[in-house]
């Protein structure tokens, strides 16, 4: 029997204000986001991600994002030791979808901005204007050291200076097709990119440090942040408030999109049992690697994404916000997320992506006031 959970009620004006976008964080790396021997074990493939994103599109998800990971954490589960590449994956997914927005992640230490500008313009053409770029500076030193391109530990304190120049080159090339930018990190000499994107290219970021938020406030279209805790859907509110305040300083509208994992079942008890089972199988060796790497950056402060990921409180799913409960409970908590000022959307992961998206679309989303504007589905995706 499904737990009885009160349905939130809003006036029409509140309902309009609380409309929230939903995205899926596709599993580009093995095993998704659960570092556990008890979680589903699988390799990343194009076919898996195609099925996930096509289901997400069917259920009116607004966007799909893939990360980039160049070296994993090892351990019994070989966590994230097996990864696809973000731009090529999303190019393929752009070709087999028609409405959902598609975002790839650029590891900016590995790709010159002019190459990213051209790749993005290409996927813009494939997708019909549905593509955007997530820019990351890089925090896991071994990812880059293995290729001989780690610039030294001083980079930790200068990475947003680097990213600022990077995005300025991108904006030049996407906006005018030409760049003569001269900076400390990049020198463009009549650099050209054509054709240009058919629509303004969206840039997103995931800054939680002061420097990261300042960058997003100046250059990003929206900023990702971690949800916090288990079944505490509004605990991220101070982070969203900081982002809102940073954006006010630049006079731009930069909303927060919040990362959550959904573990749902018919009842709260059944969902909680799954969560406890995953925690009991935590891959301690892989988690130790994460903790070790999080301590390498001694220059960016204590409020970075990786510090939160490695917190022992819930490291089994890298400490993203976790919503555990019945379908009605999860719907209620997501409506609470939507009520937080500055929260414009959520980026969701699931313990099992294919069944998770289906149950979300069939059992959770129809109960959400912040998704009440969606049309009723009339047919099932294959």
From Swiss-Prot:
Entries under CDD domains matching the protein: Alkanesulfonate_monoxygenase
E.C. numbers: 1.14.99.46
Catalytic class of the enzyme: oxidoreductase
Induction: Up-regulated by the nitrogen regulatory protein C (NtrC also called GlnG) and repressed by RutR.
Chain's role: The FMN-N(5)-oxide reacts spontaneously with NADH to produce FMN. Requires the flavin reductase RutF to regenerate FMN in vivo.
Highest taxon in the source lineage: Bacteria
Pfam families per the UniProt record, alphabetical: Bac_luciferase
InterPro entries reported in the protein's UniProt record: Luciferase-like_dom, Luciferase-like_sf, Pyrimidine_monooxygenase_RutA, SsuD_RutA_monooxygenase
Protein name (Swiss-Prot/TrEMBL): Pyrimidine monooxygenase RutA
Organism the protein comes from: Escherichia coli (strain B / BL21-DE3)
Catalysed reactions, semicolon-separated: uracil + FMNH2 + NADH + O2 = (Z)-3-ureidoacrylate + FMN + NAD(+) + H2O + H(+); thymine + FMNH2 + NADH + O2 = (Z)-2-methylureidoacrylate + FMN + NAD(+) + H2O + H(+)
Molecular function (Gene Ontology), one example: uracil oxygenase activity
Sequence similarity: Belongs to the NtaA/SnaA/DszA monooxygenase family. RutA subfamily.
GO biological process: alkanesulfonate catabolic process; nitrogen utilization; uracil catabolic process
């Amino acid at each position: 029997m499904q737990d009885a959970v009160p349905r939130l009620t809003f006036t029409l004006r509140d309902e309009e204000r609380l409309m929230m976008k939903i995205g899926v964080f596709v599993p580009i790396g093995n095993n998704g986001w659960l570092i556990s021997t008890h979680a589903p074990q699988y390799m990343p493939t194009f076919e898996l991600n195609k099925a996930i994103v096509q289901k997400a599109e069917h259920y009116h998800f607004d966007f799909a994002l893939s990360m980039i990971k160049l070296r994993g954490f090892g351990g019994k589960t070989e966590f994230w030791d097996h990864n696809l590449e973000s731009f090529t994956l999303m190019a393929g997914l752009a070709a087999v979808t028609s409405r959902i927005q598609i975002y790839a992640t650029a590891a900016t230490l590995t790709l010159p901005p002019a190459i990213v500008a051209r790749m993005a313009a290409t996927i813009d053409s494939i997708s019909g204007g549905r593509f955007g770029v997530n820019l990351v500076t890089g925090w896991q030193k071994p990812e880059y050291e293995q290729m001989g391109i780690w610039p030294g530990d001083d980079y930790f304190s200068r990475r947003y200076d680097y990213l600022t120049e990077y995005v300025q080159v991108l904006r030049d090339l996407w906006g005018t097709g030409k760049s003569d930018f001269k900076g400390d990190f990049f020198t463009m000499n009549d650099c050209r990119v054509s054709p240009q994107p058919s629509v303004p290219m969206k840039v997103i970021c995931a800054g939680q440090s002061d420097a990261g938020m300042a960058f997003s406030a100046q250059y990003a279209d929206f900023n990702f942040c971690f949800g916090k805790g288990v079944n505490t859907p509004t605990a991220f509110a101070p982070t969203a408030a900081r982002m809102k305040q940073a954006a006010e300083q630049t006079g731009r509208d930069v909303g927060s999109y919040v990362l959550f994992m959904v573990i749902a079942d018919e009842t709260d008890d059944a969902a909680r049992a799954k969560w406890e089972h995953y925690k009991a199988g935590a891959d301690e060796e892989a988690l130790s690697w994460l903790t070790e790497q999080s301590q390498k950056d001694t220059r960016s402060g204590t409020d970075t994404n990786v510090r939160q990921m490695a917190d022992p409180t819930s490291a089994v799913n890298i400490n993203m916000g976790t919503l555990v409960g019945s379908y009605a409970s999860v719907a209620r908590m997501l409506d609470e997320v939507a009520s937080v000022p500055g929260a414009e959307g959520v980026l969701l992961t699931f313990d099992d992506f294919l069944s998770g998206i289906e149950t979300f679309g069939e059992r959770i989303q129809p109960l959400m006031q912040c998704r009440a504007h969606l049309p009723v589905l009339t047919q099932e995706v294959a």
